[in-house]
């Protein structure tokens, strides 16, 4: 499972209707990790710990399906699996044959059967995990991953682990720590930061190619190793987020955010009759967007398809 802009080809009719394909649902606004790089620590948000109740989830999810959403991602915000109603929520999704995925730190064991379960691991031992995620939980997460796949269970769920790469040395160490696990993919991601402030132009031209080359060398002997597509988008700065329509993100109160990386920009509420119109008309400051982000490549496709083309009758 991967975020892939080519998936948009399967939804060509939506370029006209501009109705969302994927929904990101924040089940909580609190977390059991303390990651220093967390997107949601950058912004000043409303205080107080909150979670989406089961009844509210069913109401919001039903509304999303009415709007045409095809897939749901349980994410945050906070850590989705520590929502007290998490098991009831996933049971409802599965009983209604709704395709969904989970982004989690997996500090708490859960036993659902989503399309994918992506574990943000980021460390290769207890100390590196504590340094990157603020708590001692590495061994617990590894055991939870093993337990999830024990006795041949959940073979229809695409199970993966990922790391946000900071330096060359950790690439090999991370791989050595997870290569024996029964996972379907091992993802190496770049840092996502406001207008790419984490990387200088020199980093993109010199350091990043060294990192990606090393990741690719590992992938040659282990097909599970994935070089995240965002590595190739570090020098792409869209002029506008024309592909924002492809996703819709709601927080634990049902508020629609402009996107999952901008929780401070509230467009309206998912129950508003005109919420898609409000979202289409909302203006965001692109200079405060993350570069790269999941929609970077989709924005390139949107821009290409929006351009007038001469002699398009000849293919």
Where are these regions (language model features)?
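Flexible mid-to-C-terminal extensions adjoining Fe-S/redox cofactors in radical SAM and related proteins
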Residues: 1-19, 41, 253-315
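Conserved alpha-helical substructure of the radical SAM core
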Residues: 1-116, 203-207, 300, 306, ...
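Short secondary-structure boundary/capping segments
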Residues: 15, 109, 151, 239-240, ...
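Short, solvent-exposed beta-strand edge segments and adjacent coil->beta transition regions
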Residues: 20-22, 158-160, 290
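Generic structural signal for small/hydrophobic residues in well-ordered secondary structure
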Residues: 27, 31-32, 53, 79, ...
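Radical SAM enzyme [4Fe-4S]-AdoMet core and its adjacent flexible, acidic
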Residues: 47, 66, 87, 99, ...
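Residues within well-ordered alpha-helical secondary structure of globular protein domains
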Residues: 63, 92-95, 147, 180, ...
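Short, well-ordered turn and helix-capping elements at secondary-structure junctions
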Residues: 78, 104-106, 133, 231, ...
């Amino acid at each position: 499972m991967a975020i892939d802009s080519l998936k948009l080809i399967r939804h060509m009719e939506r370029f006209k209707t501009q109705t969302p394909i994927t929904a990101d649902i924040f089940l909580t606004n609190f977390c059991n990790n303390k990651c220093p790089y967390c997107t949601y620590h950058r912004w000043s948000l409303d205080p107080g710990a909150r979670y989406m109740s089961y009844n509210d989830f069913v109401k919001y999810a039903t509304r999303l399906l009415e709007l045409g959403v095809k897939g749901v991602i349980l994410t945050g915000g906070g850590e989705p699996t520590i929502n007290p109603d998490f098991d009831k929520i996933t049971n409802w999704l599965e009983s209604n044959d709704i395709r969904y995925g989970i982004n989690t730190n997996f500090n708490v064991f859960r036993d659902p059967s989503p399309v994918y379960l992506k574990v943000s691991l980021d460390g290769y031992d207890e100390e590196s995990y504590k340094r990157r995620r603020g708590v001692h939980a590495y061994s617990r997460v590894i055991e939870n991953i093993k337990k999830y796949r024990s006795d041949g269970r959940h073979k229809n769920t695409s199970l993966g682990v990922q790391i946000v790469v900071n330096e060359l040395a950790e690439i090999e160490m991370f791989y050595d720590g997870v290569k024996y696990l029964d996972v379907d993919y091992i993802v190496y991601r770049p840092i996502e930061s406001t207008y790419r402030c984490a990387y200088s132009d020199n980093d993109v031209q010199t350091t990043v190619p060294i990192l990606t080359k090393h990741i690719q060398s590992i992938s040659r002997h282990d097909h599970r190793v994935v070089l995240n597509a965002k590595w190739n988008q570090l020098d792409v700065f869209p002029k506008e987020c024309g592909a924002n329509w492809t996703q819709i993100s709601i927080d634990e109160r049902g508020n629609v955010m402009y996107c999952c990386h901008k929780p401070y920009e509230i467009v309206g509420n998912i129950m508003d009759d005109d919420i898609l119109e409000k979202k289409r008309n909302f203006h965001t400051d692109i200079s405060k967007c993350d570069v790269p982000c999941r929609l970077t490549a989709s924005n390139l496709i949107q821009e290409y398809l929006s351009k007038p083309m001469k002699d398009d009758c000849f293919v």
